[in-house]
Amino acid sequence: MAGAVGGHRNGYVRWVRDAEAALAFHFDRHDVADVLLTPRYWEILRLQEDNREVTPLVNQEMEARVADLEELRATYKLLRDRFSQETRRVLVPDTNVFLHYTFFTQAPWSELAENSDPRIIVPLLVLEQLDRLKFSPNQKTAGRAQQVIRALSLMLDDRSATPTNIPRGGTIEVFVDEPGHLRMASEDSEIVEVTRQLTGFLPKPARLVTGDLGMRLRAGALGVEVVAIPEEWQLKATNQSTPSI
């Protein structure tokens, strides 16, 4: 009896670890941990293998996790359908790209994508940062943020997830957080994580577009591709500096 109980428990633990490893390639690792590594999971780990409470706990937990995994499966299918057939290079710009470089509608994005028209995907967090910066005490920063938000609003309308053409070639769209997603404490890390997550659905890796050294280092540590922004894209310095976010 003890062997059967222990086998049930150990089989469940292996299932959780295998599921965590598989899902983390496509979803935010913290979201996956929230789904699988529940308080009941840790309670099961603490129990002795021959404890009679193990089997009912495992059964209850498996039933609950299967329901959660069905939701993840539905999300996975939506993302797979949206990205898996994409042949273009996907670029993920951070917020400073919109603030300190050539205005996004006029930038030659193809230079960052093997001279082909790219698919530009803007994390929702980047839009939220730009929205906050509209009220920056730095007038230059506030003005640029307002211009970007106004242009994006006109282009995307209420179809943020639908790629929209931009003047110099390529398309732009917004990547909205999945339901229940808990963001990372570091906003830079969150943008890097979005790029990593997109790569899991694409035929070729998404590229993070940033001029920020810290973000480049974070991306490199996670194996995320980064593309350097050409110096000629950078706005000329003025007496009124635009601070990084």
Residue positions per predicted region:
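Charged interaction/catalytic cores of defense and host-pathogen modules
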Residues: M1-E61
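Short, structured coil/loop segments at alpha-helix boundaries
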Residues: D28-D34, R52-V66, N138-A142, H181-I191
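Long amphipathic alpha-helical scaffold segments
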Residues: E49-R89
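Active-site-proximal, substrate-binding regions of enzyme catalytic domains
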Residues: A2, A22, R80-R207, L213-I245
